[in-house]
Design a protein with these regions (language model features):
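Active-site neighborhood of HAD-like aspartate-dependent phosphohydrolases
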Residues: 1-54
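Mg2+-dependent phosphoryl-transfer enzymes with acidic/Ser/Thr/Gly-rich catalytic loops
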Residues: 4, 28-38, 72-73, 77-79, ...
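Short, active-site-adjacent cap segments at secondary-structure transitions
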Residues: 21-22, 64-66, 112
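Short, catalytically relevant binding-site loops at active-site mouths
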Residues: 28, 61-65, 85
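Alpha-helix initiation and capping sites
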Residues: 38-42, 60, 83
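Substrate-recognition element of Asp-dependent hydrolases with the DxDx(T/V) motif
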Residues: 45-69, 80, 116
Length: 172
């Protein structure tokens, strides 16, 4: 679970894309890769942005779909073709003036392990490889690409005390 203490420190949400925001499948057949994103994940990322969090993507693969989805959601950054995620994470810390404990990171595979070991709130999706268990404090019930990000953002925003205020506009 994500404690209120840890959640209260979070200033940035950093997500892997393939296997976290998507189910990990990649479609070929044309000039561009085809990816499918869950609408609820996107809506809850918008709520995280509305709560004042820095939200961005850190992906080992480059894709126009990643950039378009990030732009649509108003995310702060997209880093692609990243082969050393820890090195890129350290750059993000410097660029945004963040400390590792102020970050939530979601991953699904061993390439994410070094970053998961550094952040304050390390999260794995339900169908992540078991090797991530040594580093994460929460494993979602939902698999990647099927609401895992929604689930995590809901827990984070609730633990931070932001959720009721963000949902007020829907309760009128």
């Amino acid at each position: 679970m994500i404690s209120a203490e840890k959640a209260g420190r979070v200033k940035a949400v950093i997500l892997d894309v393939d296997g976290v925001l998507t189910d990990g499948r990649v479609g070929y057949g044309g000039p561009e890769l085809i990816k499918f994103f869950h609408y609820r994940d996107g809506h809850w990322l918008k709520l995280a942005v509305r709560a004042g969090l820095i939200v961005g993507l850190l992906s080992g693969r480059s894709s126009r779909a990643n950039r378009e989805r990030a732009a649509e959601l108003g995310l702060s950054f997209v880093r692609e073709d990243v082969h050393d995620k820890l090195e890129e994470f350290e750059k993000l810390l410097r660029e945004y003036g963040l400390k590792p404990e102020e970050c939530l990171y979601m991953g699904d595979d061993v390439i994410d392990l070094p970053v998961l070991k550094r952040v304050g709130v390390p999260v794995a999706v339900a169908d992540a490889v078991p090797e991530l268990d040594e580093a994460v404090i929460y494993r979602t019930a939902a698999p990647g690409g099927h609401g895992a990000v929604c689930e995590t953002m809901r827990l984070l925003l609730k633990a931070r005390g932001d959720l009721d205020g963000l949902l007020e506009r829907y309760r009128r």
